[in-house]
Each structure stands twice: as structure tokens, then as C-alpha cells.
Design a protein with these regions (language model features):
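A short secondary-structure junction motif
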Residues: 70, 113-120, 190, 232, ...
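A conserved active-site cap/scaffold subdomain adjacent to cofactor or substrate pockets
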Residues: 204-239, 246-284
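A helix-coil-helix interface module used to build multimeric assemblies
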Residues: 1-173, 178-185, 248-252, 262-268
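Internal metal/ion-chelating core segments
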Residues: 138-235, 240
Length: 284
């Protein structure tokens, strides 16, 4: 499940209450008041989605309104910058995990199809011209190998960026004795990220750059595989016939004997969109 910004702001505040209470930075009365305030804000947002804000500077006034100004001590040693960075990394981490799961499903389908067609012989092409016979399994495993490399890159990203920016404040850090190790653990990270400047200025950008580049690589491999299939499907005597019906193919509105590869077209278009969106990420 991919959670939104409001969810993660709430989680960060809850983690701050627990961690700061353990470190005696909050007395028991203030900690309970802050916790009740966070729950109240969550309940208000559940009843009115317009209150499901995406920025901490809009969230904090709602907590103050539900409790009182004394709860602002919770923000000591923090900044909207380390909160924003933590929120972005946490959301991108969930999105990356979702991408891993989707890619696993694709790889699993390819491997199952390869197992089914170990002895199926098909033509392979270079420069659009039939070149050599090949087993369909071997051909499919070539694409599986490419997707597995993409999967490995995603794993590496998840490991590399599963470090928590929270508690870095902004730029030069803080002298307020926050327990960043506890904060990282409570938010599901392996450890805190060490350099405060990196935490708030570079980490969320780098994570987005790496994941978008891997997503684009997946898009290129998807496009390559679909192109091969569509070239064969378009021939007068294709050796690949798409299963009809559903979203897979649709009947031409003018030529009822014609079956257009709808799902292939849409998927290829989506893959191209991913590659173009990667360019946008690198341009920002």
C-alpha cells in the first residue's frame, strides 16, 4: 500500500512523541496531549478530506488548534525540511516496493511461459529479417534476464536509501538531543542518514533519480519485447497470435475481421511515457 503525505506527517509526529518521551524531552502530560492532538487531526481528516493536508506547515496549526500552543515543543530540533525529506523518501520507498512486486509478477509470467515452450522453435530476427531458429524459451529468458537486472537495481536502491533523514533538521543539523536511531526504527528505516545537508538537500533527489532511471530501463525492455511481438503479429502469417477478447484485443470499428492489439498498444505507450517522465525528473 502506498500512503499519502498526510499519513507520513502523522507517523513522523507519532514517532517524535514516542522518541522524545523516551529521551525525557517531553514530559508525560505534554506527550499525552500531543498524542491526543495527532489522533484528533487524523479523525478530522477522516471526516473531511480537505483537511488531509500535504505539508507540515499546514498540519501543525491543526494540532495546535486541537490541543494548545504547549505542544509546539514537539517540533524542537526538527524542521519542515527533514520532515519533507523523510516523507518523500518514505513514499518513494513504498512506490518502489510496489514496482518490485509488479515486476516480479511480469518475470514470473515470462518464466512460466518459457517453461511451457522449452521445445517450441521460433525464428529470431536481426535488422527486421529472419536470421536464426531459436527456442521460444531461450528467447523469453533473454527478456527475463534483462528484467531481473532491473529488479536487482531496485533492490539496491531500497537498501541504499532505507536511511532516515528525520532529526537532521536542515543544513547543519541541530544540537537538540534527538534520538535519531529510535526515530529511524519507528519509521521503518534501517538507520539514520548521517550527513544533515545530504538528508534534506540531496537524498530525496538522488532516490528519485535512481528509481526513475530503473523505471525507464524497465520501460525500454517492455517496449523492446512488445515491438518484437507486434512485428510478428502484423505479418500476413504471424507465428504469434494474440488471445482475443477482454483488453487484449479489440475489433476494428470499420473492419470487423480485424483484431487490433489494444493491450500491446496501450502498454507500449505507457512504457514510452515512463521514459519521457524520467527525462522530466532529470531536468528538474
Amino acid at each position: 500500500m502506498i500512503h499519502d503525505e498526510f499519513y507520513w506527517i502523522s507517523q513522523i509526529n507519532k514517532a517524535s512523541v514516542v522518541s522524545n518521551s523516551e529521551e525525557k524531552l517531553l514530559d508525560e502530560t505534554t506527550a499525552k496531549l500531543a498524542a491526543r492532538g495527532i489522533v484528533t487531526v487524523e479523525q478530522q481528516a477522516e471526516a473531511d478530506t480537505s483537511k488531509r493536508v500535504k505539508k507540515y506547515i499546514a498540519y501543525e496549526p491543526m494540532v495546535i488548534a486541537a490541543t494548545g500552543p504547549e505542544v509546539t515543543i514537539l517540533h524542537a530540533g526538527r524542521s519542515s525540511q527533514d520532515i519533507l525529506s523523510t516523507m518523500r523518501v518514505a513514499i518513494l520507498r513504498e512506490q518502489t516496493i510496489a514496482l518490485c512486486e509488479a515486476l516480479d509478477a511480469v518475470i514470473g509470467k515470462i518464466l512460466a511461459l518459457a517453461e511451457e515452450h522449452r521445445d517450441t522453435v521460433v525464428p529470431n530476427y536481426t535488422n527486421g529479417v529472419a536470421a536464426q531458429p531459436n527456442s521460444y524459451a531461450h528467447y523469453l529468458l533473454g527478456f527475463a534476464a534483462a528484467f531481473l537486472r532491473d529488479r536487482e537495481r531496485l533492490n539496491q536502491c531500497l537498501v541504499r536509501y532505507n536511511e532516515c533523514p528525520m532529526g537532521a533538521t536542515v543544513l547543519n543539523g541541530t544540537g537538540w538531543p534527538l534520538n535519531r536511531d529510535t526515530m529511524a526504527k519507528l519509521l521503518g528505516f534501517d538507520r539514520p542518514r548521517l550527513n544533515a545537508f545530504d538528508c534534506t538537500c540531496e537524498t530525496p533527489v538522488d532516490f528519485a533519480l535512481e528509481v526513475s532511471s530503473v523505471a525507464a530501463s524497465i520501460g525500454v525492455h517492455v517496449g523492446s519485447m512488445i515491438n518484437d511481438i507486434m512485428v510478428q503479429y502484423a505479418q500476413s502469417r504471424p507465428w504469434i497470435i494474440l488471445q482475443e477478447g477482454g483488453e487484449n484485443t479489440y475489433v476494428s470499428s470499420a473492419m470487423p475481421q480485424k483484431r487490433n492489439p489494444g493491450l500491446m498498444n496501450y502498454c507500449r505507450g505507457d512504457a514510452s511515457d515512463v521514459v519521457s517522465e524520467m527525462t522530466a525528473v532529470f531536468t528538474l
